[in-house]
Amino acid sequence: MNMYWFLGALLYFLIGTYIFIRVTRDSQSGSWILLALAAPLIIAGYPYFYSKKLLSKRR
């Protein structure tokens, strides 16, 4: 089960990074800049808080 969780987190990170790069390169739409700035926090923060939630349930 841990291997599947690791692969899922890796896939989530790669997709998030790809979207971040695509949004950053699209300089024509100004409304996406806020998402591009927030993307690293979302990409790094979601797995952290989700894993923290899972670990707190086990105790």
UniProtKB/Swiss-Prot annotation:
Bilayer disposition of the protein:
Multi-pass membrane protein
Any idea which UniProt keywords this protein has? Answer: Cell membrane, Membrane, Transmembrane, Transmembrane helix
Q: Where in the cell is it found?
A: Cell membrane
Annotated Gene Ontology cellular component terms: plasma membrane
> What stretches pass through the bilayer?
1-21, 30-50
Q: Decide whether keyword Cell membrane is in the record.
A: yes
What name goes with this protein? Uncharacterized membrane protein YdzP
Q: Which organism is it from?
A: Bacillus subtilis (strain 168)
